[in-house]
Regions:
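A short linear-motif detector with a strong N-terminal bias
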Residues: 21-22, 29-31, 78-81
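Bacterial N-terminal signal peptides
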Residues: 10-20
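Bacterial N-terminal signal peptides that target proteins for export
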Residues: 1-10
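A generic structural signal for short, solvent-exposed coil/turn residues
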Residues: 17, 43-45, 93
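N-terminal secretory signal peptides
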Residues: 25-66
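Compact alpha-helical subdomains of small soluble proteins
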Residues: 50, 54-124
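Terminal, compositionally biased segments
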Residues: 5-6, 22-26
């Protein structure tokens, strides 16, 4: 594979992940979509924390971009906010490692636990 092919594939992957998903609107109830958007926003609002994925540490804003892209890519599998947590935002599909949120004090929590707690706050 040439460098040009790799660059083209990289650009296509970025476009795929960044593209808005028409599937969200068709298969996901509006209330569930709003819950997912709120959960993603809550991750982005973590000012004193980092998102840990496959051993690498990321700023919350990068985690937001990543979670939206992964949700977009897996939109046909996500029928609820709980599905989003379980199928998209909890662990790496490649390595099987759980995603973590690492706070400035060194404490870590699985993203699944954080998101489930946040979901409880927004559900009636």
């Amino acid at each position: 594979m040439t460098a040009g092919n790799i660059t083209t594939l990289s650009v296509l992957l970025i476009l795929l992940l960044a593209a808005p998903s028409f599937g969200h609107a068709q298969t996901l109830p509006a209330a569930e979509k709003q819950k997912i958007e709120t959960l993603i926003t809550r991750v982005g609002d973590l000012k004193d924390a980092k998102f840990v994925r496959n051993g690498s540490t990321y700023e919350p804003s990068t985690a937001v971009w990543f979670l939206r892209g992964k949700w977009n890519f897996n939109s046909s599998d996500v029928k609820s906010a709980r599905d989003f947590i379980d199928k998209v935002a909890s662990m790496s599909g490649t390595s099987g490692q759980p995603y973590l949120i690492r706070f400035n004090d060194g404490k870590e929590i699985h993203s699944r636990n954080f998101l489930l707690a946040e979901l409880k706050k927004i559900e009636p």
